[in-house]
Amino acid sequence: MGPTENQSFEIEFPNSSNTAAANSISTAINNNTTTAATITFTPANNNINNINNNNNNNNNNKFNSNFDIESNKENSINQSNINSNVNSFPLKIQTKTLNSTTTSSNNNNNNIFSIGFRPLSPRGVSPRFHSNSSSSCSSEISTPSSSTFLEDPNLIASNTISSNNSINNNNNNNNNNNNNNNNNNNDNSNNNINTNNINNNNNNTNNGENPQKKQRNSQILSKNFYSLSLHADSPKHSRSTTDLSTFLGMSDPDVMTYRSKTFCISDFHQFDIDTTTNDNKNKNNNTKSTDESSTFDGKSSNSVENNNMTIINNNNNNNNNNNNNNNNNNNNNNLNQDRPTIPTVAHSLSSNSIPHKFNSSNSLPPQMLSSSAPSLFSLLENSNNNNNNNNNNNNNNNNNNNNNNNNDNSNISINDESIVLISTPVKEYSYNRSLCLSDEEGGEDDEDDTPPTPIQLVRPTPTPINPSLSLSLSSSLNATNSTTYLHLGRSATVLLNPPLLVSSMRQHHNSPSSSPSQSIPIVQTRERSQSSLSFLSPYQQQYYPSSPELSPMVPTPLVNRIFNNINNNNNNNNNNNNNNNNNNNNNNNNNNNNNNNGTNSNNLNNQSTSEDRDDSPNTSLDQISGSPYKTPSKLSFHSPNSSAIFNSISNSQQTGKRSRTCLDFTKFSSHLLDEDSSCFSTQTNNNNTSSTGLISPSSSPKQQNVLIENTTNTTSNSSSSSSSTTTTTTTISVTNTLAAIQQNLNSNANLNNNNNNNNNNNNNISSYFSRSNSISSQRPPRPLSMSSSFISRQSPDIHISSNSLPKPVDTSNTNNNNENENDTNKLDKINNVNSNIAKIIEQQQQRNISNSNNNNNLTQDQDQQDDQFKAKLLKQLSGRQGYNGVSSESVYELLKNPTLINAIITVVDCRYKYEYDGGHIKNAINIPPTGSRQMVLDRFFKFPTPKNQQHVIIFHCEFSSKRAPDCYSLFRELDREHNEYPNIHYPEIYLLNGGYKKFFESFQGDMCEGNYIRMDDKLYQANLKEEEEKKKKEKITIRNIKAFKNRSHSFHV
């Protein structure tokens, strides 16, 4: 990306209570960055039509018809019948960072990112589903009966932004949200948003245009739709990493278009805003997602109709429950007050994902998006380091940051967070797709309605979940304003590729009523091989999508959501002690929990220093960009401006470091599963944390929790600089899939099956899982070959003793008799061998005698076989390979004194006739290239030389380079044809080295007759041409004769 580009990030909050958060972000940008940063607030009372026009005319060109006419048609919403209540439109925040005014090595490139959320008018929606339209938009918050989104009575009756009733209750609890928004700046004083008004807008009838996509089944959805529009101004990317344009599921990263899509609710696709400093964050960011494939890259926009999209700001709920947060922050405002918490992107590019968090009120601006690859287990792995990032501000800081945005925020730290929930549809497939299809091999095209290429979903049978189970939630998700989530991890049977990459994500915990054991989201793993998942309720719909965009064969981790179990806490007041959701609002209970765990709020603050270390093994896929996988498992996107933005605060803390580990679940193989085996669980009481132990499945129906204590030694930043041991608890919800974990822990960590020995079990689990906050492992083993050769391979016939070693030879019973017998056996064997050798010699002698009687004995045959390679009479010279060469001097001596050898000497001149007539060696015969075959046959093989007489034949041409070697080869070929191999008539054949030219230059006056005529002599050009034509015709004739001989001569009448 070019260094002159700007960067912007735009968020439209669908709740008026987030005005304070917007102002806090603005203040944080202006006070904590060295770059020129501005925030634009669009008042909520602006007309929706005007805002839509602004989207069509601004620099983002979100709905520019010049780039995508179809998308423009699809997103040009008819707003004529929208409710006139303009206060329902959400607040829009645009954060735009200009080029840095200072020079920084980490701020070389910039991006433009723009994200907008807005509610859409009801219109015809055509989700890219592949089942019937009646069941295409399946709601995950429906009743146990399988009802669609339109049929859900809870959705129709409720007037909430999200499909969860908890958000509505949070926004209307004690009217504290309105109070917070009234304390903001004057430009946002009228930005109070009523969620009921938003829902009223969305309840209008469909007046929009029908979708323009071909072969789509239109379906009118009349409630709670939101649009997500993105704009990323960047050139074409390579397919190395991810960027903002491909984050929301667009398939083709090489097409620069403005694109927007609308989707039905059904499942979440979340992302976080990351401001982590990273030097290598602005390289070519691109990968292909499998969420909802369509053309999307670079300058583009994406419109997602979202029912579950909301931004929850805990800071705006100043009720009695939030006062507990302030009290908790008062106890922890000393150590980390100057330390801003920087969130991290963590998301899943599939139809399933987990809720992720980012700070919206007191955090630093969302300037930078991370490029490393987090996963669903990041919440689990990073809980040890990130439990206490929210305990940074006191009550005064909360009031100042919420009500007075003009205050100095140089010491801003984060004590609350927001959650962005972007809804995308989940497809109910009745078929299985390949795990490894790429776009080139049949992937989804942007213009057709085929399902996403690499998807494989298995929908389990839902059953009600046991309400007695205590579900541990993040403390930031208060019971009054949050949604309960259950995360399902990767199953063992589908982990076929490299281990899962896990990236750290800081956990922010506001609620003092939740203990550390309650502050970690639930992570659950389950085997894919279990066909019946009866323990899941309709609120726990599981899907098993596979995403080869992460890596070719690694399926996307399971994700599960729970929408109930928090409704009981939505309308509770200060005395809400219901612990069904682990979100107690009683501060005393939280203190008791902390005391039971041997920690307090001060110790929790001490742990924040452990975030600066990166002790986990470096298993990031950044190191293997040249791997055979299509794209690295890098699911987030980034911008390099964070180093300059946080230049003023990065000197004292290194919050940009990210801990990465590999979680390997292959050791928990499916064959170790046993539904009757026990699992670890955590039983959460009302006033204290639960104990951890081994329980039987009868104690809870097929779902228990695991409480893992990871003990990490951290050094406090306090003045005493004393080292303290912080015990962080991580709660993992497991099913019978992790029954194998119990067996491994029992064998490796020597756990006892006693429920009373809780402390020992916790320590053993800690020693098994912690290892510097990382779980590293090896790749899964390759599958065994099932070929016939492998099956037929047999093990050696060796007797194995009990200790798996060959049995030694027993020599205790040996005696002299046995030794003598062994000696006699050896002599017999030697005699047998000698007799066999003697028989072979006799047979060979008999064969030689028979050959001698036929004048064709073995020795003569061997000699004749060797004669074709070496001469017996003349001294050979190194000439052309495969030919017996002889020098001109040897030929001269032989011709001058024929009596030197007892043989017939013949010199064959292979030149053309005009050359031979011009001059030749004495007594030489002329066999030109044309007609050479017949002449050789007539001259040498019609009456061959007798075997008792030797015949020496010497071939030459002008240079002995072409014509003479050809005649030499022809002569040997004809000799083979007239004899039975290895017998030949003329073993003594030679090739004159240097040809006639060299011989004439040496002995022209003595052994040569005439002169020397060159082949290319100008006086004989006509003769040369005539000879060459004859040679061509002869080659054609010979080719035809060979073809006729090879033909089949069978004729059928």
Curated annotation (Swiss-Prot):
Q: Where is this region: Disordered?
A: 125-217, 231-253, 273-412, 438-466, 504-532, 562-638, 684-703, 747-829
Q: Compositional bias (Polar residues) spans?
A: 296-305, 347-365, 617-638, 785-805
What one GO molecular function would you report for this record?
Answer: protein tyrosine phosphatase activity
Pfam families from the entry?
Rhodanese
Rhodanese domain location is: 901-1001
Provide the reaction this enzyme catalyses: O-phospho-L-tyrosyl-[protein] + H2O = L-tyrosyl-[protein] + phosphate
Q: Gene3D superfamilies given for it? A: Rhodanese-like domain
Q: Give the UniProt keywords, A-Z.
A: Cell cycle, Cell division, Hydrolase, Mitosis, Phosphoprotein, Protein phosphatase
E.C. number, please? 3.1.3.48
Q: Biased composition, Low complexity: where in the chain?
A: 131-147, 158-207, 274-295, 306-336, 369-412, 511-522, 564-606, 684-701, 747-777
Active-site positions on this chain: 957 (cysteine persulfide intermediate)
Swiss-Prot/TrEMBL GO biological process terms = cell division; G2/M transition of mitotic cell cycle; positive regulation of G2/M transition of mitotic cell cycle; positive regulation of G2/MI transition of meiotic cell cycle
Q: Which domain of life is it from?
A: Eukaryota
Q: Give me the Gene Ontology terms describing cellular component.
A: cytoplasm; nucleus
Similarity-based family: Belongs to the MPI phosphatase family.
Describe the function of this protein.
Answer: Tyrosine protein phosphatase which may function as a dosage-dependent inducer in mitotic control.
Query: What PANTHER family does this protein map onto?
Result: M-PHASE INDUCER PHOSPHATASE DUAL SPECIFICITY PHOSPHATASE CDC25, PROTEIN-TYROSINE-PHOSPHATASE
The name under which this protein is listed is: M-phase inducer phosphatase
Protein's gene: cdc25
